[in-house]
């Protein structure tokens, strides 16, 4: 009887150990699966952040000439046109969620997207980018968008939230006369620093010094 009881007790203990081991194994498998999914998710996010973003093609400024009588004076830069394209392999970039930070002398301004009224269709060209009527809708804290290449219509089909995809080309339009009205725009020989910050991916640095003198209305800055 005692041997039988001991045998049954041992069997019960053995079964309990097997059950505990099975439960533990299930927990480990579940945890392992979660960690694997989490690692894959983090990896995808990291890849997206590294490859995504915008690159600057060129930056142009507009310094209009003001004529009074026989005297012509070249004003400060009153408008900026920043030509941008997505990085190679970038995820789509929503310009509605993009921010631009610019610092001129002691003034820093954060620009946000100005809405569908500040989006212009330039896919068929523009006679003079700085004289287009779209500038009338751009104030000192908003930026507009000139759409140059939009093969899949990702920007023009939804002007309220334009998305840039691979192969697209756009111009970010900034009214520097209103943004930096303290200086009447951007003066000659002035350092301009800033960043274009997309909703994901690395920010794009702006770092330039304007020419010592403005000899023409259209000035390539970067």
From Swiss-Prot:
GO terms for molecular function: structural molecule activity. Residues 1-4 form a propeptide. Flagellin is the subunit protein which polymerizes to form the filaments of archaeal flagella. It comes from the Archaea. Its main location: other. One of its GO terms (cellular component) is archaeal-type flagellum. The gene is flaB5. One of its GO terms (biological process) is archaeal or bacterial-type flagellum-dependent cell motility. This is Flagellin B5. Keywords: Archaeal flagellum. Transmembrane segments: none annotated. It is found in: Archaeal flagellum. Belongs to the archaeal flagellin family. InterPro entries: Flagellin/pilin_N_arc, Flagellin_arc.
């Amino acid at each position: 009887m005692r041997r039988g009881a001991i045998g049954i007790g041992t069997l019960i203990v053995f079964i309990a150990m097997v059950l505990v081991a099975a439960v533990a194994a299930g927990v480990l498998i579940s945890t392992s699966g979660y960690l694997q999914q989490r690692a894959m998710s983090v990896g995808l996010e990291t890849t997206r952040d590294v490859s995504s973003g915008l690159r600057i093609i060129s930056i142009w400024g507009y310094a209009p000439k003001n004529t009074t009588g026989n005297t012509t004076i070249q004003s400060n830069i009153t408008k900026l046109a920043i030509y941008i394209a997505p990085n190679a392999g970038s995820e789509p970039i929503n310009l509605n969620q993009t921010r631009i930070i610019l610092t001129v002398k002691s003034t820093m301004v954060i620009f946000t997207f100005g809405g569908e009224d500040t989006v212009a269709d330039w896919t068929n060209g523009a006679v003079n980018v700085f004289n287009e009527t779209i500038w009338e809708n751009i104030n000192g804290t908003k930026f507009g968008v000139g759409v140059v290449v939009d093969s899949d219509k990702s920007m023009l089909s939804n002007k309220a939230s334009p998305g840039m995809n691979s192969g697209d080309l756009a111009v970010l339009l900034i009214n520097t006369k209103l943004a930096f009205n303290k200086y009447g725009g951007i003066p000659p020989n002035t350092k301009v620093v800033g960043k274009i910050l997309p909703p994901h991916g690395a920010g794009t640095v702006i770092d330039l010094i304007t020419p010592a003198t403005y000899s023409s209305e259209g000035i390539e800055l970067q």
